[in-house]
Amino acid sequence: MKQTWRWYGPNDPVTLSDVRQAGATGVVTALHHIPNGEIWSVDEIEKRKATVEEAGLEWSVVESVPIHEDIKTHTGQYDLWIKNYQQTLRNLAQCGIYTVCYNFMPVLDWTRTDLEYVLPDGSKALRFDQIEFAAFELHILKRPGAEADYTAEEIAQAGQRFATMSEEDKARLTRNIIAGLPGAEEGYTLDQFRQHLATYKDIDKAKLREHFAYFLKAIIPVADEVGVRMAVHPDDPPRPILGLPRIVSTIEDMQWMVETVNSMANGFTMCTGSYGVRADNDLVDMIKQFGPRIYFTHLRSTLREENPKTFHEAAHLHGDVDMYEVVKAIVEEEHRRKAEGSDDLIPMRPDHGHQMLDDLKKKTNPGYSAIGRLKGLAEVRGVELAIKRAFFSK
């Protein structure tokens, strides 16, 4: 695997020097300062690329070129935003950047309820608490019809949890959910959030798939033409939330994508932490079935709790993800590619490290502090080395 590191640009508290010292050779970044829908110019791309290369690194993957909400709802100027997206892909290819991670999640990108969940060892992790999320949806957001998405027991527990919350607890929970997490391109006030949710009131899974298919049929031929590989990121969490449909959550969704636009430019980001939240997702089977189309990997693990819809970010080699088998399947796919004459390594980044040690004293991007990811990268690197020595050394 090609070892990479997500970097949020010049304002990231983790510097490119830190990234290089961690042992990564590639950088995963995006032009977050450009508004959603606007074209990334060659000049802006080259500026960022030069910054990365001056640090002795390579811009390996774009994460993400965000998709304008008009495209997802098929309203407004969606065709203009698609044309702009096509041009951005052409410009990236012109600059020698050929792997693009993106997602098609409505309204929100990844969602958590607690950004500072304290683990027994004192480090901090990200957590999604199903009951706290229900308390937000039922008692703060007050989304019509939300009760249908929860069991009677969850509704009762959410009411009890809400009753014990201080005003600061409610404000923090609201911020965590709607204000935008690192890498998310949108943040909302509560009223704006309600308005955005309302734009999806007539959009179910089938309709959102129609809109995604329209996007893919417009984008993938351009990507194919210029040599860009599109790598869709799964939904996080991988199930419907807030009454919104989710369409990149299962192996069946992956198969639908391939059948909809059967081009090798139409590929996947294997995010083990997102797909792995669902017990019915067999990560190794996903890699084996769609290995030739996996162009990027996010390696992390989550741990489901007593309520299986509640989970927190586990250490990279613990939790519900069998990281050994996952890495072995990825190495096997790379070995297959090499046997066919390609030295095409799959970029991997350690995802969502714990906030720990000296980083506990610093202001960090949730999930993206340096030391926790350094630890995760070192652990995964060791697993990969052991697998290669045991199974693939001559």
Swiss-Prot record:
Pathway: Carbohydrate metabolism; pentose and glucuronate interconversion
InterPro entries membership: Man_deHydtase, Xyl_isomerase-like_sf
Reactions listed under catalytic activity: D-mannonate = 2-dehydro-3-deoxy-D-gluconate + H2O
Enzyme Commission code: 4.2.1.8
GO biological process, one term: D-glucuronate catabolic process
Tree of life domain: Bacteria
Cofactor(s) annotated in UniProt: Fe(2+); Mn(2+)
Single GO molecular function: mannonate dehydratase activity
Keywords: Iron, Lyase, Manganese
One Pfam family, short name: UxuA
Primary role: Catalyzes the dehydration of D-mannonate.
Family: Belongs to the mannonate dehydratase family.
NCBIfam families: PRK03906.1 (NF003027), uxuA (TIGR00695)
Name of protein: Mannonate dehydratase
